[in-house]
Regions:
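A short, Lys/Arg-rich alpha-helix, primarily the initiator
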Residues: 1-19
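DNA major-groove recognition helix of helix-turn-helix/homeodomain DNA-binding modules
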Residues: 49-65
Length: 415
């Protein structure tokens, strides 16, 4: 927040530009202006406010941060005051307040990450040799649905990954930086923070391309496609994911890790096609994914970038058929799935929420509640933190308040 508080809007633009790896001429090309104009913007010698706002949007400076730097914030940041009357403690009464907030993690953590995306923080000072372990720990937090903890650790992880890449300029360190942004994008997408997720996915893709690693590029592209789907850009998502499939296939699929990446990208292609309403493509791709995963182990080795398994493909099939509106087929695809087939809390919870969506699509509130309760008991964050799942809980309470378990679900989402 230092640049914002000191009214250095141009510095925010510069930091955001450099974080994307752009030169002033690169930003100028996107703004349809000259390099010298960009230079004046960054030095604070231009009064072109619309151009400044356009530049800020391109390089990912959050709007509130830019407004503060321009002195346009007329009031301090809002604070939350909790009225602790007995009625307020009833989760049913608290629910509208939670829904209005639309953010199930501490706002301070999200603001801190947004600031880190606008201006990369100073490195933490942790030894460079620990970065791989910290990336693994971050993936572990995501897998454990520990969303707040991961939000807390991401700013320093991104800062140190940036430092490593800038010091060595090695392909491996750019791949590590891409991985850090990929993890950030995964989390932000799950939390429904799609603008920030798009920014981090773009950066993950950029640094993966610099690294030359087809697997890092596939991971980044998968997240980019996911956020594009949420933004209603299904055609762009499909184009990105199909290009990534081709790049992975071009490796020759000589290793199990490459074969797993290929199966994962086919699953992502199938789901993207289903969201776009391309039934034929979706069904062909999910069948291809099942074939590609046929020889993969039932339990992926620890640390694998794409820990896809035959059961995981079946879970994707549930999502594909749900997206196509075929709830019965989705439930049939998931008939033999059980939580023990999935190694992480996040995946166990996701299995139950995906089945819940299918039951809800089939207008079966009792079964929907049962699956959501199973998810909440394993991974509360999968129910509490995901906007789409919270919406199902809201709808259950509005339409079926007397179904057994609804009050328990509301209490989980209001926690």
């Amino acid at each position: 927040m230092e640049f914002a508080e000191r009214r250095h809007a141009g510095c925010l633009i510069r930091v955001g530009r450099e974080a994307r790896g752009w030169r002033q001429s690169d930003l100028g090309m996107r703004l349809a202006c000259s390099q010298s104009t960009v230079s004046r913007l960054e030095q604070g010698r231009s009064l072109d406010l619309p151009l400044l706002k356009q530049a800020a949007d391109l390089v990912g400076v959050p709007g509130p941060l830019l407004n503060t730097s321009l002195g346009l914030s007329s009031s301090p940041a809002p604070t939350v005051v909790v009225d602790r009357t007995p009625a307020q403690e009833d989760p049913m009464r608290r629910r509208p307040l939670i829904t209005a907030a639309a953010l199930a993690v501490p706002l301070s953590l999200m603001t801190r990450l947004e600031s880190a995306l606008a201006a990369t923080p100073e490195p933490s000072g942790a030894p460079a040799r620990t970065l791989d372990a910290r990336l693994a720990a971050a993936r572990g937090q995501f897998d454990a649905a520990a969303h707040a903890g991961l939000l807390r650790s991401l700013p320093s992880l991104l800062a140190d990954a940036h430092q490593g890449a800038s010091e060595t300029r090695r392909d491996l360190d750019y791949a590590r930086l891409s991985s850090a942004y990929t993890i950030a994008s995964q989390l932000l997408n799950k939390l429904g923070q799609y603008k920030q997720s798009r920014l981090t996915a773009d950066r993950a893709t950029l640094y993966a391309d610099v690294s030359g690693s087809p697997l890092a590029a596939a991971a980044a592209t998968r997240e980019l496609a996911a956020v594009l789907r949420h933004q209603g850009q299904e055609a762009a998502a499909q184009a990105h994911i199909e290009a990534a499939v081709a790049r992975v296939e071009a490796t020759g699929l000589a290793t199990e890790a490459q074969a797993a990446a290929f199966a994962q990208m086919l699953c992502s292609t199938a789901y993207t096609a289903a969201i776009a309403g391309d039934r034929d493509q979706a069904l062909v791709m999910i069948r291809e994914a099942a074939r590609a995963a046929r020889d993969l182990p039932d339990a992926a080795p620890a640390g694998r970038l794409f820990p896809i398994t035959p059961a995981a493909v079946d879970l994707y099939a549930v999502g594909v058929h749900w997206a196509l509106g075929d709830a019965g087929t989705a439930l049939e695809a998931g008939r033999n799935l059980h939580a023990d087939q999935f190694p992480t809390i996040e995946r166990k919870g996701r299995m139950h929420t995906d089945l819940a969506r299918a039951w809800w699509q089939r207008a079966k509130p009792d079964q929907t509640v049962g699956e959501l309760l199973s998810a909440a008991r394993l991974a509360p964050g999968e129910v509490r933190d995901r906007p789409a799942i919270r919406q199902i809980v809201d709808d259950l309470y509005a339409k079926h308040p007397h179904v057994s378990g609804v009050r328990e679900l509301v209490a989980v989402t209001a926690a």
